[in-house]
C-alpha cells in the first residue's frame, strides 16, 4: 500500500512542474528569456488569440472585465469614455480588443 502512495505522490509532484525551453534551428535573432539572456530564437509560436467565438468563461464564478472600446491604458489613466468600468466590483481577467477606439486620446 505504501508503494501506491509513493507512486501517486511522485505523479502529483511531477505534474506541478513547469518546463521552459527552446528548440534548435538556424535563426540568428537573440532574445532574453525568463531563465537566460541573449538566447537564439529557435522556434516561435504566437499564442495570442486572434479570433474569438464570443464566449468568455468565468474563473471561479467571477466574470472577466470586458473593456469594449477602451484600452487598458485609457482605463487606467482616466479616459472619460472608460468611466463605466470604474463601477465593476470585481473581475477575473481583462478582455481588450485588438485596436480599441478609446485609448489615451479622447474627443474634447
UniProtKB/Swiss-Prot annotation:
One of its GO terms (cellular component) is host cell plasma membrane. Glycans are attached at residues 25-26, 38. Keywords: Clathrin- and caveolin-independent endocytosis of virus by host, Clathrin-mediated endocytosis of virus by host, Disulfide bond, Fusion of virus membrane with host endosomal membrane, Fusion of virus membrane with host membrane, Glycoprotein, Hemagglutinin, Host cell membrane, Host membrane, Host-virus interaction, Lipoprotein, Membrane, Palmitate, Signal, Transmembrane, Viral attachment to host cell, Viral envelope protein, Viral penetration into host cytoplasm, Virion, Virus endocytosis by host, Virus entry into host cell. Residues 1-15 form the signal peptide. It is a single-pass type I membrane protein. Belongs to the influenza viruses hemagglutinin family. Homotrimer of disulfide-linked HA1-HA2. Major glycoprotein, comprises over 80% of the envelope proteins present in virus particle. The extent of infection into host organism is determined by HA. Influenza viruses bud from the apical surface of polarized epithelial cells (e.g. bronchial epithelial cells) into lumen of lungs and are therefore usually pneumotropic. The reason is that HA is cleaved by tryptase clara which is restricted to lungs. However, HAs of H5 and H7 pantropic avian viruses subtypes can be cleaved by furin and subtilisin-type enzymes, allowing the virus to grow in other organs than lungs. This is Hemagglutinin.
